[in-house]
């Protein structure tokens, strides 16, 4: 009866977790461990994960593997390209650092999307822009979350141009940003941990901005009591 299944196929991140399916938490699925951290705090190996295509959703569901890491990485942050012929995702590289990769839906053409000479930079939670550029969350500030003594790195957003390799930081927040998403009007919606005008200790508000990082404004949740946190 679920009308969301009235389609030919869907693309999913698939994790084979055996008999512990009813007990898993975010750590077991390769994502951040709590509501203030980001992908740099997630486990970097030991997963049996893949990107898969599911079809025949109303009958005997068929599964086709699109991509499976050989290094035990998880495959979070799936984002389909506008042309629907490829997708981006996050995965650890050979140096065990998070990077943004792209693969075609037929499983070919795997490549890293963001190239930078700064080897300590990590990128994840990215999105395609209509201009051909990318926005990704990164540890570019090299700072930690203050209320946990810096034990979790802060992720702020960057703008990357694949044509010339230019990288520009867009946000300079004390705490993390998550889930940049292109809105119908071309602006970027995202969530941000907020310490200003908060009514709760744990506050994640929905923000929006222009793709170049200008006009960062609250979209939903600023000053409200409930819900006190939003997620992607």
Indicate where each model-derived feature is located.
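Beta-strand-rich domains and repeat architectures in extracellular enzymes and scaffolds
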Residues: 1-58, 70-80
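Beta-rich catalytic cores
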Residues: 6, 47, 74-76, 83, ...
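Short coil/turn segments that connect the beta-strands within blades of beta-propeller domains
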Residues: 7-8, 83-85, 131-133, 185-187
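Short, conserved, GDST-rich strand-edge loop motifs in beta-rich repeat architectures
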Residues: 15-46, 92-93, 97, 136-153, ...
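A short loop-to-beta-strand structural motif that recurs across blades of beta-propeller domains
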Residues: 43, 50-52, 99-101, 156-158, ...
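Multi-bladed beta-propeller domains
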Residues: 58-73, 104-122, 160-175, 210-229
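Asp-box/WD-like beta-propeller blade repeats and closely related beta-sheet repeat scaffolds
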Residues: 96-178
């Amino acid at each position: 009866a679920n009308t969301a299944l009235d389609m030919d196929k869907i693309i999913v991140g698939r994790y084979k977790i055996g008999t512990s399916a009813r007990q898993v938490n975010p750590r077991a699925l390769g994502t951040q461990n709590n509501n203030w951290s980001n992908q740099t705090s997630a486990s970097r190996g030991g997963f049996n994960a893949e990107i898969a295509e599911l079809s025949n959703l109303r009958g005997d569901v068929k599964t086709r593997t699109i991509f499976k890491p050989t290094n035990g990485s998880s495959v979070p942050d799936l984002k389909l390209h506008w042309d629907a012929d490829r997708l981006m995702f996050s995965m650890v590289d050979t140096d065990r650092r998070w990077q943004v990769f792209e693969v075609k839906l037929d499983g070919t053409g795997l490549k890293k999307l963001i190239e930078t000479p700064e080897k300590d930079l990590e990128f994840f939670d990215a999105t395609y822009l209509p201009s051909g550029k990318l926005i990704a969350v990164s540890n570019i500030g090299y700072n930690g979350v203050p209320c946990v003594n810096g034990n979790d790195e802060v992720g702020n957003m960057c703008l990357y141009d694949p044509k010339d390799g230019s990288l520009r930081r867009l946000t300079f927040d004390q705490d993390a940003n998550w889930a940049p998403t292109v809105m119908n009007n071309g602006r970027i919606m995202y969530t941000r941990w907020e310490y200003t005008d908060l009514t709760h200790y744990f506050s994640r508000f929905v923000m929006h901005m222009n793709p170049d990082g200008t006009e960062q404004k609250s979209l939903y949740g600023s000053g409200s009591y409930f819900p006190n946190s939003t997620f992607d």
